[in-house]
Every structure is written in C-alpha cells, then in structure tokens.
C-alpha cells in the first residue's frame, strides 16, 4: 500500500523583482518524516520554508497538504488556516506572557483554561521538558529554554507539520547540541513531520531522514543522508557533503578509473565519457586491512604525523599525491616510513 505524502510541492518558482530565488522546486514529504533543507546563506531555503508557511507568495507552482491545495494558481490559503507550526531562530515569545500562556496562545486564545486545553498544554510541557518553567516569563529563561517553549507552542495545536528556520543557530555550541537532541526527540515522540532550514552539514547528516541540497534556488538532490554522502548524483553535491579527494581520472572500463593514485574501482553506472574526475573520501583510506578483500592497495610514505589524543592524523604520499588519514589506534610509526595503504569502498567517477 502506497502512503500519500503529507506535503507535496510542485514546480515552485519565486521572484523578488527581477531576481529568481526559487527555480522549479518539487519534492514531497511523508508523514512522520524529518527533512533538512541544507545550503549556504542566500540559497533560497528560508524563502522556500516561508512559502510553505504562507508568508511568501510564489509566482507559480502548487503546494499541497495531504489532498488539500494550500497554494496554486489564483489560490492562496492564509497562513493561519494551513495548520502548520513555525519556529524561528530566536523563538520570538510574547514577553508579557508566562511560559504556560505562551503555549496556550498556540491553541488560539492564549488562556488555556478549559480542562482539555490544560491537559494538552501539560502534555506538551512534559514532552519538551519545560513543565517546571510554566510560571516563568521569557526574560527569566535561557536561550535553550526559550527555544523549547517556542517548539511547545508550535506543537500545542497538534499540527502534522512543523517548520523550523535554523532554530539552534543563536545558541552556543554546547547548548546547541543538547537542545537539538531534546527538540528532535520531542518531535519524534509527537509524530509530527518537520522541515528544518540549516547550513550545518553535520547537523543534517546526523538528524535528518532526508536532506534536500539547495544551491542558488534549486534542489540539486534530495535523498537520505547516507545516499547523499556515499552515492551523490553530482560532484558538487559530493564535495558539499563532506571532505573529499578529487582527482582527474580516465575511465579504463566500466568498473575502473585511473588517476594519480593508481587504478581505482568505481561504482558509477551509465558513464557517458571516458575522461572526468574521481572522488574519494579520506576515511576510505586506512593503514590497516579491515577486510579480507580491500578495494585497492597502494604503497605510501609517511610525510607528517600529528598526535591528537584519541586519534592520530598521518599524511601519506602515494605516487606523489599526499592524503591525510586519521587513525583511532596510533601505531608506532615515523616520518619517512614506507607502508601499505588500503582503500575501502569504491570511488565515484564524474564525467
């Protein structure tokens, strides 16, 4: 049985005066799914989020929430009727209302006096870990506490979709990690779908069900974090998703490419040209044989060693090209040592 998407965006285009900021955006989001819109500042990800919320009006395209059209030709459902939650960078709580009444505002009246509303508010405060803060006002809260209250307010009316615009960017690194984990856990437990805007690659790799890579108003690729990291469709996506080694290469056959390092097995299919570039991740290289059949074997020479405590970074030169390898277990090695270097996993060839 095929489940209908919770959200469907079709061929969305948006202009600010003569500048096009969204180019033919199309994607869908399943119920309970968490999607991260990942890209550099100014790439269009916040504009896309605001268009879904109803704060920005696209020039063309359609937005569907389940089987209900919320934006289309000559039709734009007002934001307050879309039944979506929205959380921005700094929470934006009402300073004259305490935590309880800020959350109650999410239910529509800001009072939360009847028994059903009280029960719902208490459930949400428990879920987001702010039950003990009910009587405090925003100025009495830390940045992380304010973000939890903002999420609680967005979850209060039980929306099926929550939109979050870089909700952790204003927090310091230690607090950001803690609040991020707590808020993601609360979202998972609530059963709501969510779309996050972020420029933090590591954050999206760690927490997303799917990631949409956005560049200059276009979605380059949307897929699971693992697929985007290890099997991206485009070289630019591959480089954006993590540290990479990119070398000119020639295709020897459909399974092998030749580059400065040597002959590299590749896993791409349907390659149209013989000349291109090969991409490898540094973590594919190891000084240890971690499997019976490594993908490839090279001879290398140690050029630099950097001890970092639990790991040691080692610069190895292979056929005149230097790469850095991080080893969790630090062997007794010296600069100038010659040793075998193992490659694990196949490379990616881009014509």
UniProtKB/Swiss-Prot annotation:
Reactions catalysed according to its record: Fe(3+)(out) + ATP + H2O = Fe(3+)(in) + ADP + phosphate + H(+)
GO molecular function: ABC-type ferric iron transporter activity; ATP binding; ATP hydrolysis activity
E.C. no: 7.2.2.7
Keywords associated with the record: ATP-binding, Cell inner membrane, Cell membrane, Ion transport, Iron, Iron transport, Membrane, Nucleotide-binding, Translocase, Transport
UniProt-listed InterPro entries: AAA+_ATPase (IPR003593), ABC_SmlMolc_Importer (IPR050093), ABC_transporter-like_ATP-bd (IPR003439), ABC_transporter-like_CS (IPR017871), ABC_transpr_FbpC (IPR015853), Mo/tungstate-bd_C_term_dom (IPR008995), P-loop_NTPase (IPR027417)
Gene3D superfamilies noted in UniProt: 2.40.50.450, P-loop containing nucleotide triphosphate hydrolases
Subunit relationships: The complex is composed of two ATP-binding proteins (FbpC), two transmembrane proteins (FbpB) and a solute-binding protein (FbpA).
Protein name (database record): Fe(3+) ions import ATP-binding protein FbpC
Species: Haemophilus influenzae (strain 86-028NP)
Taxonomy of the source species: Bacteria, Pseudomonadati, Pseudomonadota, Gammaproteobacteria, Pasteurellales
């Amino acid at each position: 049985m095929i489940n209908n998407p919770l959200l469907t965006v079709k061929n969305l285009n948006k202009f600010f005066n003569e500048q096009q900021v969204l180019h033919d955006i199309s994607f869908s989001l399943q119920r309970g799914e968490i999607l991260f819109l990942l890209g550099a500042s100014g790439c269009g990800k916040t504009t896309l989020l605001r268009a879904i919320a109803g704060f920005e009006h696209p020039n063309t395209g359609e937005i569907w929430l389940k089987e209900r059209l919320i934006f289309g030709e000559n039709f734009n459902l007002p934001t307050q009727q879309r039944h979506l939650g929205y959380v921005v960078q700094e929470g934006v709580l009402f300073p004259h209302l305490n935590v309880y009444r800020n959350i109650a505002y999410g239910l529509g009246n800001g009072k939360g006096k009847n028994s059903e509303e009280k029960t719902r508010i208490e459930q949400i405060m428990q879920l987001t870990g702010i039950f003990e803060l009910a009587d405090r006002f925003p100025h009495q809260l830390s940045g992380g506490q304010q973000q939890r209250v903002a999420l609680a307010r967005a979850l209060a009316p039980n929306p099926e979709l929550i939109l979050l615009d870089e909700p952790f960017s204003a927090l310091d690194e230690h607090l950001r990690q803690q609040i991020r984990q707590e808020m993601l856990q609360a979202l998972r437990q609530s059963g709501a779908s969510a779309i996050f805007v972020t420029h933090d690659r590591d954050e999206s790799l760690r927490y997303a069900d799917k990631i949409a890579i956005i560049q200059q108003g276009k979605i380059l690729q949307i897929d699971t974090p693992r697929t985007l990291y290890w099997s991206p469709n485009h070289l630019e996506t591959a480089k954006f998703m993590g540290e990479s080694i990119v070398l000119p290469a020639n295709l020897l056959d459909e399974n092998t490419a030749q580059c400065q390092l040597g002959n590299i097995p590749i896993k791409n299919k349907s390659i149209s040209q013989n000349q291109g570039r090969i991409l490898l991740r540094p973590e594919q290289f190891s000084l240890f044989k971690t499997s019976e059949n490594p993908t490839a074997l090279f001879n290398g020479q140690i050029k630099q060693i950097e001890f970092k405590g639990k790991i040691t970074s080692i610069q190895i030169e292979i056929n005149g090209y230097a790469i850095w390898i991080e080893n969790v277990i630090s062997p007794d090695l010296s600069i100038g040592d010659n040793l075998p270097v193992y490659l694990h996993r196949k490379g990616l060839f881009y014509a």
